[in-house]
Structures are given as C-alpha cells and as structure tokens.
Amino acid sequence: MITKNKIVKIIELAKKCNECALHHFKKFDKKSVNYKDDNSPLTKADVEVNNIAVYGLQKLFPNIEIISEELYNSKHIFKNNKYFWLIDPIDGTKEFINKSPNFTVNFALVKHNLPIFGLIAQPTTGTIWYNFNNKAWKLDKDQDFKSSQIIQCKGINYKKLRTLSSFNHRSKELEDWMSFVKPISDQDIGSSIKFCYLAEGKVDFYPRTSPTMEWDIAAGHSILKSAGGNVISDSGIEIKYGKMKFLNDIFLAHGKTKNIPHKFLIKLKNKNFDNYDKDLQESISELKKENLVVFPTETVYGLGAIGSSKK
C-alpha cells in the first residue's frame, strides 16, 4: 500500500503544504480569522493547505476515503472502509494564530482502525517526521528522502520521568496526574510535535485528559509506534480510529517500556489509587472465598469473565 515511491511523493506533497502554510504564517493578521460552528478558529492557511493535501492524496490514492478536519461535519457519512486517511491541514491553529512556530501538517493512513503510516511536517523549520518499514524517520529541511535519519524512543527511567503537554489544554485532572508521577521536567509544546519528541527519545510521556479528534493524533501515533512507543487509552488498550464522530477520550502517549504502571492509568482517570487498590484487594479476597477466579480480557486493567476454580 505505501511503497518507497509513494513515500517520496507524499513527502513532496508535505513540502508543498509547508510552503503554503509558511506563506500565510509570515503575513498572518488575526483580523482574518474566521470561526467554525464549534467556535474553533479557521484561517486561510487551514483551507488552502487542506485543498493541497486532499487533492494530492486523492491523486496518489484515488480509491481511499479522506477524512479531513476542514471537510468533516457531524452529518458526514463515514464508509468505514478497510483503509482511510485522516488529515489535519494545520494542527495547532491556536499556535499559528499566536505566531508560535509549533504548528504542523498531519497525514495518517489507517488500516483496520489502526494507523499504519503517519507524516508530520513543521512548516517553520521544514522538518518532516514519518514512519516506513516499521521504523520512524526524521528528514531535515531541504533534504531529500535518502537523507532521512532513523529515530527511536529511549527506555523510560521511572525515577527521572520527562513529560510534555500543551499548557493551552491544562486541566485539573492533568495537574493532579503530574503531581502524582512527579516528573523532573514538563515541557509546554503545542500540536503533534509532542509525538515527534517522544519518538526521538526526548521525553517519556504525553498525557491528555481533555478531548481531541482522531486527525490530531493519528499521524503521531503511527510514527511513535514505529519508534518503539505507543498511544493507549486509560484502560491500557491501544487507541483505535474510526470511532463515533472521530472523537478521542483520555489517552497516554509513551516512550519505550514493557509495562505502564497501572496506577498511572488509574490516576489519569482522576481516581484515588489507594482507594482503587483497596477495593481491588477486597474484591480478590471475596472471589477467593467463593473459589472464583477472574479470566483477564484484552486489558489487564479491567475484570473479564468470572468462573469457578474448583476442578
């Protein structure tokens, strides 16, 4: 589906999107901002980059449905095919409006509800991140495909955790989570660049307790996974795509690790871990009294089926 030749052409398309976005960024005037029905900002850059991206991907992949932030509305009839594209022409529109360089162009190809290819381009630096052949890559400005460098997550040191988040979306739940895990550093970064920093091994966790849309994170998810990390829900299951209204709930993006401490996920739900652990131990004790056992499901953080342990 994604061949080397297709990657080269997608990168060329991303560079065209970068040029368009940067052109508008340099001459941007806040008076030109419009607002959508949900009160989110819309700029000329959003519209024009979207047109370039959609036209380019339709030309390369004529039979694959494209879901774009700027084309989607609640009445959209999603075909939920085997493959579909998720596009965010300007991820971090607030950063763009406030003249911050941290906005991106995002493309993601989804297969069976999981992202298999992602590309994130940062117009202000010309940097492009993408994944291909189960590896994550970084391409600096004015370089061609052959100059791409492999990037990888670093193993998480739980005694020296490094986190990042967007201070524009800082909730009480997120503040509580940060106080609980006690990172040695917490960077404020907008847009999907957060996933790129994770993929490069610069940080360990990106927690999110406020809503996002699938096109916000799918490209970063794909790149991060190829770099050795992942994006999971508060139940410990990998985030899926093609959900109702393309809306994400709470998630935790992480670097390379064998296991995420389940107390991190419990706290992400804003639950008291001590009370949760106490209730869990009491439930286990009651199960043992009745000679019952629990069969785990896909997630180890929830109960599955209950049956007798008697032979």
Where are these regions (language model features)?
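Conserved beta-strand segments of alpha/beta enzyme cores
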Residues: 65, 184-185, 230
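N-terminal subdomain of lithium-sensitive/metallo-dependent phosphomonoesterases centered on the IMPase/IPPase/PAP
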Residues: 1-90, 176-179, 266, 277-302, ...
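Oxyanion/phosphate-interacting regions
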Residues: 1-18, 178-180, 194-292
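DPxDG-like acidic metal-binding loop motif
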Residues: 78-140, 146, 305-310
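Short loop/edge segments at beta-strand edges and connector loops
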Residues: 68-70, 190, 235
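Residue-level signal for inorganic ion chemistry
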Residues: 21, 46, 57, 93, ...
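Phosphate/pyrophosphate- and phosphate-bearing ligand-binding catalytic cores of soluble enzymes
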Residues: 148-220
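Short glycine/threonine-rich catalytic loop with a Thr-x-Gly-x-Asp
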Residues: 46, 96-97, 217
